């Protein structure tokens, strides 16, 4: 049976309702000749929008003000400028960068750190805390006014007052204050006001800038920075925590191998004795050989339990280990004083005094670094017989914790790229008479031009990046094209004929080539540019893509000695030399239409008549047997199938 239809009466009501609705709509907008009481010849008070408006957005406020002023807006369709996506780099032009640098120099004096207010024995703890809060609040307001009025960009800085309180206490009890900076951009991570604050507290305290990751610089680059800081009357030391750790690991492996060889020799010599004699000989021999290592392990365990897992203390109860020593420990401290004095006298005889007056550009080792610290401070010490070195100030990824672990010879501080990872300062004794006072890593305020510079410097986390175009564009501007191609083994698309042939590649060109090479593709089959950007930026921060900022007054292009080592391709047709055994990658053609039109190499035409058969062309003369044999040998006999004399069909062309 077919589908039963609805009764006819059911659709009549809907038809009448639809007709009535259409009539009402048509009469609403048309005039009628019928008489009505609504003349519409006055102000319609019944249809006013009497809704109260107490708050409105900026756009609504602007439109309402324009309506009250009687301003009419007309769309302008002339002078339209389309901004392509590749032009949105987020970088500054040369004129803008020079203007911002001038503003940085003019407002350098406002870039300061909070000071601890003056206090005396009559000041109560509540009054001191309130004064510290007031000074800290005024300092933050000053930085906010600097950003708003001058339109300057500041780096992220520490906004927790408790961290600054620990900074004040560490400076007060330190003899040498060490700032750890990155060798690729020392001026960005240096805080000049911290050096002034140290001298304000005590003129006998010394300031030192420890330039970490100096192994990334060449000897000429280190010499240039040493000369610059020498003119600024600042002591700098070139240091590499990673190289020092590798050297220490190599020494430990050699010592372990030496101990294994000695143990094997001892076992071979005593193999002829019985078990009782062997056990007796081992008990006599092992303590004399392994006692230093056992003592080091015991001290290591004690130090780890004492410093790494120490609970958080109150601010009024912060004391170092030397302040809580008993009478027995005071005798030990007296021995430390005598040994440290003897060491300093011996070192003063060995090392020439001119080393304290000049900055040397060579890369120091761990032992040389400790000797320089001992020679640097010659005034009155905070604690007699003990040299206290305050460390820990610096941005993330500059190597604060790695430096301390390398100096101590084992892991004393956990390493992290997060600011504020160390919650409280701790004292670590390197040797008798030399103490490291590790302060939580404080991030000082500094000037930057763009947010992209902060991302490329490692200040902002790369994984939390919102827009990848400006940082990658900055990488393309700093790293030449041939260095990028040689580092990743890619071919970046060349500029068009109407563009500058020496322009840097855009972020899209670099990320597209890198994404194709690594296989980072989206669901739509396009290169995953944000994912590729994270890999490239991490390589830039880690130093795989190396760019070193020069001292003021030096040319940034000629300062990059590491870029001049790689040969630059002089012509566009040159290809990167590949390793033997690998297939050459296909070059990308920037304009496939022009290449196809002007370079038609395989042009064929359909002709009729006598054609070349078996290598013979009409009018070419007598065909020799050698020519026929060569033609036959060049082909594949198993592909002929007896179709040699048949003409090719036109549909196959």
UniProtKB/Swiss-Prot annotation:
Q: What Pfam families does the annotation carry?
A: MMR_HSR1
Instruction: Cite the entry's keywords alphabetically.
Output: Cytoplasm, Endoplasmic reticulum, GTP-binding, Hydrolase, Nucleotide-binding, Nucleus, Phosphoprotein, Protein transport, Transport
Q: Which segments does the entry list as coiled coil?
A: none
EC code(s) of this entry? 3.6.5.-
Q: What is its main location?
A: cytoplasm
Q: Where is the composition biased (Acidic residues)?
A: 299-333
Annotated Basic residues bias: 16-28, 637-647
Q: Which cysteines are joined by disulfide bonds?
A: none
Among CDD domains, the record links this protein to: HSR1_MMR1
Q: Which GO terms describe its cellular component?
A: Cajal body; cytosol; endoplasmic reticulum
Q: Which GO BP terms apply? A: nuclear export; protein transport; ribosomal subunit export from nucleus
Q: Which residues form the signal peptide?
A: none
What PANTHER family is this protein classified in? LARGE SUBUNIT GTPASE 1 HOMOLOG (PTHR45709:SF2), LARGE SUBUNIT GTPASE 1 HOMOLOG-RELATED (PTHR45709)
Q: Which family does it belong to?
A: Belongs to the TRAFAC class YlqF/YawG GTPase family. LSG1 subfamily.
User: Could you identify this protein by its name?
Assistant: Large subunit GTPase 1 homolog
**Species name:** Macaca fascicularis
Instruction: Quote the gene name from the UniProt entry.
Output: LSG1
């Amino acid at each position: 049976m077919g589908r039963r239809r609805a009764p006819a009466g059911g659709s009549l009501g809907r038809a009448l309702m639809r007709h009535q609705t259409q009539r009402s709509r048509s009469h609403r907008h048309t005039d009628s000749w019928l008489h009505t009481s609504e003349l519409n010849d006055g102000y319609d008070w019944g249809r006013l929008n009497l809704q109260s408006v107490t708050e409105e957005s900026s756009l609504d406020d602007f439109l309402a003000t324009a309506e009250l002023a009687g301003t009419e807006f007309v769309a302008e369709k002339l002078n339209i400028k389309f901004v392509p996506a590749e032009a949105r780099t987020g970088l500054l032009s040369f004129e803008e960068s020079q203007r911002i640098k001038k503003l940085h120099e003019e407002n350098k004096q406002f870039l300061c750190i909070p000071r601890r207010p003056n206090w005396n024995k009559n000041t109560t703890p509540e009054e001191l805390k309130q004064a510290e809060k007031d000074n800290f609040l005024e300092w933050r307001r000053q930085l906010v006014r600097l950003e708003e009025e001058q339109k300057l960009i500041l780096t992220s800085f520490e906004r927790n007052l408790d961290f600054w309180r620990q900074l004040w206490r560490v400076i007060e009890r330190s003899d040498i204050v060490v700032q750890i900076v990155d060798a690729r951009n020392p001026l960005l991570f240096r805080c000049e006001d911290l050096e002034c604050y140290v001298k304000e507290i005590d003129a006998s305290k010394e300031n030192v800038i420890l330039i970490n990751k100096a192994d990334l610089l060449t000897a000429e680059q280190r010499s240039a920075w040493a000369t610059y800081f020498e003119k600024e009357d600042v002591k700098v030391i070139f240091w590499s925590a990673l190289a020092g750790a590798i050297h220490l690991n190599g020494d430990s492996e050699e010592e372990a191998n030496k101990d294994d060889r000695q143990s094997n020799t001892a076992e071979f010599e005593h193999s002829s004795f019985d078990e009782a004699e062997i056990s007796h000989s081992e008990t006599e021999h092992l303590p004399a050989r392994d006692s230093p290592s056992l003592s080091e392990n015991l001290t290591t365990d004690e130090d780890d339990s004492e410093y790494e897992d120490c609970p958080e203390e109150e601010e009024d109860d912060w004391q170092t280990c030397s302040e809580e020593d008993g009478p027995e420990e005071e005798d030990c401290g007296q021995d430390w004083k005598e040994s440290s004095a003897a060491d300093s006298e011996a070192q003063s005889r060995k090392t020439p005094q001119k080393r304290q007056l000049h900055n040397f550009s060579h890369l120091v080792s761990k032992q040389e670094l400790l000797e320089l610290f001992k020679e640097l401070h010659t005034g009155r010490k905070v604690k007699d017989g003990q040299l206290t070195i305050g460390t820990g100030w610096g941005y993330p990824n500059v190597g604060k914790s790695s430096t301390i672990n390398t100096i101590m010879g084992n892991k004393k501080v956990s390493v992290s790229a997060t600011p504020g990872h160390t919650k409280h300062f701790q004292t670590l004794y390197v040797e008798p008479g030399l103490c490291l006072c590790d302060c939580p890593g404080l991030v000082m305020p500094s000037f930057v031009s763009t947010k992209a510079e902060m991302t490329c410097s490692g200040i902002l986390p790369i994984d939390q990046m919102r827009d990848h175009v400006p940082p990658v564009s900055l990488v393309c501007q700093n790293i030449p094209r041939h260095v990028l191609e040689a580092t990743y083994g890619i071919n970046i698309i060349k500029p068009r004929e109407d563009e500058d042939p020496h322009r840097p590649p855009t972020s899209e060109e670099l990320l597209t080539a890198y994404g194709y090479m690594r296989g980072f593709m989206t669901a739509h089959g396009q290169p995953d540019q944000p994912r590729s950007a994270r890999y490239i930026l991490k390589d830039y921060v880690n130093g795989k893509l190396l760019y070193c900022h020069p001292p003021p007054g030096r040319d940034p292009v000629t300062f990059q000695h590491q870029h001049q080592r790689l040969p630059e391709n002089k012509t566009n047709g040159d290809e990167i030399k590949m390793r033997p055994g690998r297939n050459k990658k296909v070059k990308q053609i920037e304009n496939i239409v022009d290449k196809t039109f002007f370079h038609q190499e395989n042009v064929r035409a359909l002709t009729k008549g006598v054609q070349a058969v078996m290598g013979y062309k009409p009018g070419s003369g007598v065909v020799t047997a050698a020519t026929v044999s060569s033609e036959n040998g060049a082909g594949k006999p198993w592909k002929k199938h007896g179709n040699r004399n048949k003409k090719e069909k036109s549909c196959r062309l």
